[in-house]
């Protein structure tokens, strides 16, 4: 963990403690991923270590070239990201988007990130779990968690969503792709396995 990581993570943990956010490790992992270990220009210039896209809740708009995933393929495009005058503005927006202050277990938190399409990378949840595991971030949550169980929870989320696809909850074709966003490929692969 870099000194830059440590500084921003300490600020986030303090924010969590003041704002009833019990599961800190998931947000901490996202901070590390989205800010490229606290080095991205989006973080250093615009106080947006979470990579939050622009909405009316941001203080201003910052446009950057980024990599998105569409139908499992990487594409480069310009995207409008949120800019904030300070980190608290970003932390407040993240809490609003993710409901981090009302979700109190890992599976629900990860499932919700997937549900809202927080990222288009189909491996995003796995990346979060890898960072949590690599840096033992669950120690900040104040609960003991078997890190292997984190991957089991990811598999449970994929399984749950795949069964919803089979039940027709996400429609077909383009409707399904839109509904599942960047997670379409990994979930559709599981659907195909279940239907064999």
Task: Annotate the PLM regions.
Residues 132, 137-142, 181-196:
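Repeat-associated, polar segments at repeat-unit boundaries in modular proteins
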Residues 165-166, 191:
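Hydrophobic aliphatic residue packing
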């Amino acid at each position: 963990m870099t000194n830059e990581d440590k500084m921003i993570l300490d600020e986030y943990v303090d924010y969590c403690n003041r704002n009833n956010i019990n599961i800190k490790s998931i947000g901490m992992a996202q901070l590390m991923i989205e800010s490229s270990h606290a080095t991205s220009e989006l973080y250093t210039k615009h106080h947006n270590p979470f990579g939050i896209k622009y909405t009316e809740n941001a203080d201003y708009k910052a446009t950057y070239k980024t990599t998105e995933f569409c139908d499992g393929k990487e594409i480069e495009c310009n995207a409008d990201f949120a800019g904030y005058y300070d980190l608290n503005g970003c932390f407040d927006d993240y809490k609003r988007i993710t409901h981090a202050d009302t979700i109190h277990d890992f599976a629900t938190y990860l499932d919700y990130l997937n549900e809202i399409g927080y990222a288009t990378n189909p491996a995003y949840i796995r990346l979060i779990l890898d960072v949590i595991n690599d840096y033992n971030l669950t120690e900040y949550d104040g609960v003991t968690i078997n890190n292997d169980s984190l991957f089991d929870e990811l598999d449970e989320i994929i399984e749950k969503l795949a069964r919803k696809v089979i039940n027709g909850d996400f429609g077909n074709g383009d409707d399904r792709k839109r509904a599942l966003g960047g997670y379409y490929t990994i979930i559709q692969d599981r659907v195909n396995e279940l239907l064999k």
